[in-house]
Amino acid sequence: MLVTCAIGGVALADPVTITDVAGRSVEVDAPVKTMILGEGRLIYAVAALEDGDPFARVVGWRDDLGKADPATYAVYQAKYPQIDAIPTFGGIKDGTFDIEQAITIGPDIVVMNLEAKGATEDAGLIEKLAAVGIPLVYIDFRDAPIANTTQSLEILGTLLDKEARAKELIDFRDSEIAKVTDRLREANPEKPLVFLERAAGYSEECCMSFGNENFGLMVEMAGGINMAKDIIPGTFGTVNPEQIIASDPDAVIVTGAEWDAYVPGGAWVGLGPNSDPEKAHEKLANLMKRPAFTGVKAAETNNVHGVWHQFYNSPYQFIVIQQMAKWLHPDLFADLDPEATFKELHARFLPVDYDEGYFVSLSED
């Protein structure tokens, strides 16, 4: 059971015990009025559950959204200019999270990504916050998103008093994933070998990828075989160029975003709302000129695609599962429209309009 109510009633804040994705039992007065987001990109989920201003309860957040996803930041900033005034924090993993600032703000809850658990424990953050009555919960859309997204949305639904809306989103997500997995199960098509390059062009080194989790698991759900699943033991890791050439993947899918804040003018593929399709296409094509892709089947046949990197860190993974399925099995999923699904997500759950720019493909040449 996710939540055990200590006192009845839902209109007022009551003590509830939440089991977070780390398996911790955390007592919280819910619904919360104020919260600090240990990562700014957690707003992807918060915005989908709040039926009003998604920043109304956010009294502090990590400064990553404007750097890692400036296009989305700009979309929300245009409608909610007050986000510029929200106090920002550094990351717990790099030691720049200001605990004293968090205590001074005094939120009802601090919400952290599961990947920060080790650093959070090393810093004694949970104990320091608990000493002043501030609970901390972990949610996860990155380390094991397929397994943890449902529970993470349920936790946020409880914290925000949006349980019904969270269930609606979970049901929508599940039904859209089933459109892919059910058809694949019935048709049982031959599965192409896929190389997933994480943040392609972010650095000159080649190549970051995914093990059997996150995008690595998503591509398997979409009817592909993740080339690196037996090479990378965890969620994230690297493969060398020789492994790519020797494996000769049928398809290549890279992740990309606007990363000028980190790597100005880099070779990365800028994807996200309102991205430049011609520029993204050109940069994707240039990435295939690297030695790691010399003579590789996917590059030779233009079976090369790019997706918005932040799908790996949001509850929107079902969109990219549909898009990858359509690329990998175009005939089987000829009637599937991932963009229409994304538009429906925006119309039903998000407070901003949908803008194109999340995908690019060389196969359209």
How does the language model describe each region?
Residues 12-365:
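N-terminal ligand-binding lobe of clamshell/alpha-beta domains
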